[in-house]
């Protein structure tokens, strides 16, 4: 039996609209992470308070954290077509993650880095998103 595949033809988006889309997604993700009533699991948004009760060097915990975060973000952000979550730093008082994002209607990957800092998440890359 021959398998047929359907390909959706997506309209092209101009560079300016792509830049606005990227900034909007990053801004919305940062808001989601810093929301006191976020729909994300507490370990994913609470950062350090929850992270300190675990062994941050535990590779199984790191893998679980990345899988859970990826699943939650894909559920809550419909503009993301593909996502890879990496821990850049995972120490007792430092938690830094990198999100490698592919958006629908965008051919270039988007890297969004987040760091837990003084009780909240901040991004060093939001200003550089284009």
Swiss-Prot record:
The keyword Oxidoreductase belongs to this UniProt entry's keyword annotation: no
Coarse class of the protein's main subcellular location: cytoplasm
Any single GO CC term annotated in Swiss-Prot or TrEMBL for this entry: cytoplasm
SUPFAM superfamilies tied to this protein: gpW/gp25-like
Coiled coil start-end: none
GO terms under biological process: cellular response to oxidative stress; DNA damage response
A Pfam family reported for this protein in Swiss-Prot or TrEMBL: GPW_gp25
Subcellular location: Cytoplasm
Record keywords: Cytoplasm, Stress response
This protein's record includes keyword Cytoplasm: yes
Family, per entry: Belongs to the GpW/Gp25 family. IraD subfamily.
SUBUNIT field: Interacts with RssB.
Protein purpose: Inhibits RpoS proteolysis by regulating RssB activity, thereby increasing the stability of the sigma stress factor RpoS during oxidative stress. Its effect on RpoS stability is due to its interaction with RssB, which probably blocks the interaction of RssB with RpoS, and the consequent delivery of the RssB-RpoS complex to the ClpXP protein degradation pathway.
HAMAP family in the cross-refs: IraD
Protein name per UniProt: Anti-adapter protein IraD
Source organism per UniProt: Escherichia coli O7:K1 (strain IAI39 / ExPEC)
């Amino acid at each position: 039996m021959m398998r047929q595949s359907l390909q959706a033809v997506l309209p092209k988006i101009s560079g300016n609209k792509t830049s606005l889309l990227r900034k909007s997604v990053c801004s919305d993700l940062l808001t989601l992470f810093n929301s006191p009533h976020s729909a994300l699991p507490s370990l994913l948004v609470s950062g350090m308070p929850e992270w300190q009760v675990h062994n941050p060097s535990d590779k199984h915990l790191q893998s679980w954290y990345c899988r859970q975060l990826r699943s939650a973000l894909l559920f809550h952000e419909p503009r993301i077509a593909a996502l890879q979550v990496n821990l850049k730093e995972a120490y007792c008082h430092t938690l830094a993650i990198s999100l490698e994002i592919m958006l629908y209607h965008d051919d270039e990957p988007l890297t969004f880095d987040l760091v837990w800092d003084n009780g909240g998440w901040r991004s060093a890359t939001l200003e550089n998103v284009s």
